[in-house]
A protein has these predicted regions:
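Conserved small/polar residues in nucleotide/adenosyl-binding loops
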Residues: 173-174
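Short, flexible, mixed-charge acidic loops at enzyme active sites
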Residues: 161-169
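Conserved AdoMet/S-adenosylmethionine-binding subsite of the radical SAM
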Residues: 4-154, 158-162
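Iron-sulfur cluster-binding cysteine motifs and their immediate structural context
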Residues: 1
Length: 175
């Protein structure tokens, strides 16, 4: 599909959008598709459509060429939905295999640039529910100037059957 095809498809649903509505792009990971999204969001903005990116933030870096493309995409984006899985870097590495430093840097950068964002945090029992970590998450969010909403989401087991179908043990699930 082309950006034009996707916009044409999205516009079919415009009569159902309330209060103006808009387009939210999620993943996989939306920031891995920046070239496509830049073209898609240019078309959407030409139609006056509100644009949102749902991201885990992991690909973010200030290194080129990523950073220039990100800035172009950021300027076409009205709202970012950003997941903060774990504020503690060591625990984040244990949970995801990656540092959270680039995710926290993205949140700070978006705030510094005046970009609106919603922060989401999933409560996974014994993994992301430590009181000290939750307090530090709140303290970090309090430093951000453009957070419009914080969503604390309960962990659910809806993906378990997919893990089982793929023959991969889901380490987050205990019966």
């Amino acid at each position: 599909r082309t950006p034009e095809d996707l916009l044409k498809q999205a516009l079919r649903y415009k009569p159902y959008w309330k209060n103006g509505g808009g387009i939210t792009v999620s993943g996989g990971e939306a920031l891995l598709q920046m070239d496509f999204l830049i073209e898609f969001f240019k078309l959407a903005k030409a139609e006056g459509i509100h644009t949102t990116i749902d991201t885990a933030g992991n690909p973010f870096t200030r290194e080129e060429p990523f950073f220039a493309k990100f800035n172009e995409l950021m300027n076409l984006t009205d709202l970012f939905l950003l997941d903060i899985k774990q504020i503690n870097d060591d625990k984040h590495r244990d949970l995801t295999g990656f540092s959270n430093s680039n995710i926290l840097d993205l949140a700070q950068y978006l705030s510094d640039q005046g970009k609106h964002m919603w922060i989401r945090h999933v409560l996974v029992p014994t993994i992301t529910t430590d009181e000290d970590d939750l307090r530090k998450t709140k303290e970090f969010i309090d430093t951000l100037k453009t957070v419009d909403k914080v969503e604390v989401l309960p962990y659910h087991k809806l993906g378990i059957t997919e893990w089982e179908r793929l023959g991969i043990p889901c380490l987050l699930y205990t019966s």
